[in-house]
Amino acid sequence: MELVEITREEVINNCEKYYENRQQFFIKTKHKEGLESAYLYQWEKYDDNFEEIKVVYCFYYDSGNSAPFDDEDIEHIYIIQ
């Protein structure tokens, strides 16, 4: 087993699969040394017109923080393969 770097696009394109499988991620952020373990968190929000609810996924870190995929603090995303 080894850590493999994946892109944000891969996460976005496969977020439902990763969420359902409880895929563990390891995230490297700008402001923290080492990797932080994370999973996908799912929540619902209304669109801009408050007419339709969208499902949104973001990273939820074991430390209790959360971040969207496009967070500028995220430098690298890894999974175990």
Report residues per predicted region.
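Mixed-charge, Lys/Arg-rich low-complexity intrinsically disordered regions
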Residues: 2-17
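Acidic, low-complexity, intrinsically disordered interaction modules
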Residues: 22-78
